[in-house]
Curated annotation (Swiss-Prot):
Protein name: Sodium- and chloride-dependent betaine transporter
Signal peptide (UniProt feature, chain positions): none
Transmembrane segments: 45-65, 73-92, 117-137, 211-229, 238-255, 291-308, 320-341, 374-393, 423-441, 458-478, 499-518, 538-556
GO biological process: amino acid transport; cellular hyperosmotic response; gamma-aminobutyric acid transport; glycine betaine transport; intracellular water homeostasis; monocarboxylic acid transport; neurotransmitter transport; response to kainic acid
Principal subcellular localization: membrane
Native source organism of the sequence: Rattus norvegicus
Amino acid sequence: MDRKVTVHEDGCPVVSWVPEEGEMMDQKDKDQVKDRGQWTNKMEFVLSVAGEIIGLGNVWRFPYLCYKNGGGAFFIPYFIFFFSCGIPVFFLEVALGQYSSQGSVTAWRKICPLLQGIGMASVVIESYLNIYYIIILAWALFYLFSSFTWELPWTTCTNSWNTEHCVDFLNYSSTRAASYSENFTSPVMEFWERRVLGITSGIHDLGSLRWELALCLLLAWIICYFCIWKGVKSTGKVVYFTATFPYLMLIILLIRGVTLPGAYQGIVFYLKPDLLRLKDPQVWMDAGTQIFFSFAICQGCLTALGSYNKYHNNCYRDSIALCFLNSATSFVAGFVVFSILGFMAQEQGVPISEVAESGPGLAFIAFPKAVTMMPLSQLWSCLFFLMLLFLGLDSQFVCMECLVTASMDMFPQQLRKRGRRELLILAVAIVCYLMGLLLVTEGGMYIFQLFDYYASSGICLLFLSLFEVICIGWVYGADRFYDNVEDMIGYRPWPLVKISWLFLTPGLCLATFFFSLSKYTPLKYNNVYIYPSWGYSIGWLLAFSSMACVPLFIIITLLKTQGSFKKRLQRLITPDPSLPQPGRRSPQDGSSAQNCSTSPVKQELIAWEKETHL
């Protein structure tokens, strides 16, 4: 576009933008382009973000990491990363979305065209998440439907899928004492591996499609589609239920868990501090990666959700509250998990360490085994899998919403028209469903593990976080971004946030990133099955496909821009002049200012000429 400056009679210059040839759009097309929309109120934004960041990892990952890494001592490195990385980067992404009113790709493109690959990388990660995360919902639906029986099907060894090595819970202790068989299995394990997954011997043998899981996956996608098909108008209403219902289930399970025999021993096992574990660098790496996982950082979701805020929304206060809510939920979930694991260990007469699990092993093996030992086991099974379903559901459809938002902001003239959004969501759902069918084959679990271990791994998130804080702190300028934030919320955030962007966060991300690489251990399914070399190659391809976006788009944008290298670099680190500048009111808030002392031209020139840290 060309900039056109006119001067009013009062002497105030006004900037307008004239489309260049090829950018003209007839009036009919203009009228058809719909507005992005905004949240109806703050609560819709808060619940949507809470639904995205508070998910399955809070229940099945954090408690296990806490017990594994020194109990209460784990909170020391956890809160160091919480204040130096979690809150600063979380706030950065939300504020960026609110400031630019754009999805992940176009927001970074406007802030710094040279580093727009950050946004593209987040879209790649979102795409992977949309393919594999919803598989967990299909499993949860399968277990939920299986819970509506007189006897839970994973209680006994008399089912058609059980083998001669199956030993039910009543005979478990005596079998252990007699060493009846070194290869004995439990009915809950056989239900999981033989009835639900039908798992094969390895990734080389995918087997046939598990049609029941395929139907559950289809149902999950249908639910997700109708949760977001009308944009923030529908998403904002759905999260009132999906984001709050898991808390009701969590409270019910907490009350039930702490009243079980053996619960106290389980909670002590969860929280008893072992300060000597802090000497192990692995503890610190686990704390850092857990922060990035649980806060949904570098996935583009926070930027997209923040983009639907009003310009003067206090996103700083919201971000801090949401971060504390997320960590508090993880902490409380630990009481639920370990009170029930303590009960299960006491009932079986084994140490708690033998029943402690993380990930799918906790959700689909340990907990189903625990509920069979309770009175009214069908009720507790239904409640638990309903909680899992809703914990994962809002994370899934909000992630899909953010992917759609990024796409529509990249191509507004084509996609932001009547009926186009619904078709885009339908197309994304169909493509992701068809690709997801590969993960509900008999060998699909091996592929799921590759996605989970590599596609959205801590290495990818740490790498992108490093470039995010470098972009805002050093290229765009931390002081300049603080000016933008002050213009939005009316005051400047705590100085520690800026210090974190400039020094603490990049330092910790870089150190943790290289340590993660040095301590890399190849994926093993159940710590037994070793993938073939081509399987690991696929995993690393998934990881590098997102990280490679940053250097790749740096090279592409430099090659496409004309001029000397210095001029190209200067142009590519210059923010888009259409971004709001301090003193210029946002049109979406219904106010405008024509003040000569802070004219748009003057503000724009200040923004363009202000030196960056680079």
